[in-house]
Amino acid sequence: MKQNNAACPIGCRYCVITQVGYRRCQWEQKFLIGMNKTVTILNPPPDKNDMNVMDSFYNFPLELLEADRVGFNAISDPFWQKYGPELDWFLEHVAPIVKVAACVTKMPVSESLMRVLATIKNFQLNVSITGLEIIENSTTRSRLKTLELAKKYGVKAFVIIHPYIAGMSDLSFLPKLKAIGYDCVDVKGLRYDPSMADWMPQAARKFYEGTEGKEVLPEDGWRKKIEVAGLQLKSLRQWTEENQQTEPRLSRNEAEKRVRKLLQYANITSSDKNAAVIQAAIERRL
């Protein structure tokens, strides 16, 4: 069932960027900057042979990101070796001017890289574990190992079950998560696309058919499994805010001005209304 995807080595069959039509069009139109209510995301170009778009990444006006929370590479996995130079550049040039520098990954993170991440005090590592190995080129075991390394080296890390697919996601990893020192998780739903019927069993499809474009999180017992494992639910946004630096800050006037300029580059990738995303981007900088 696994697929190869030139855009990402994980090749998730449910990928909202490659498998959900309207989201794919969004990212094709504007790939460099994504914005939601939690973070701004800086994406390196999918085609690294196009020098014009590579210049747009390396010459991006970084003052527009100052004092924000900024994630690296949401259109692929940030730790894919292909983007190693761009990750290094992000950690060197973006991390020092923001409140939070973040990555969301499903890939294994090596011990040597974890040691580097540990030196960046405002870095946050978000590990997505789904229990969906059959449709991902990654394993639950490797992601638990990454989380163990984060504990070993003191890297702030958080777990997201993203997406949870009713009738498919295997949550048997939850007790192990608790055992290695994590106390809370976030759970996100699935944005269904009819093309997913090719690999999704009917027992799961019944929860999603007719919901195209909406994030759906069925109540099928996953909350109880989290409770039994001794874990608590917490949103990624709340955890990020609780663990962010308080500096740097901008004045409200300056924050509003920079966000207006940032919107010229940005693709708003949120189910929230645009006005709410823009207001959140301003407030993050204060």
Q: What label would you give each PLM region?
A:
Residues 1, 13, 72, 283-285:
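Intrinsic disorder/low-complexity detector
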Residues 1-49:
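Canonical Radical SAM [4Fe-4S] cluster-binding loop centered on the CxxxCxxC motif
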Residues 42-44, 59, 161, 246:
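Selective for proline/serine-rich intrinsically disordered segments
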Residues 54-225:
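Conserved AdoMet/S-adenosylmethionine-binding subsite of the radical SAM
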Residues 171-286:
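Auxiliary Fe-S-binding modules of radical SAM enzymes
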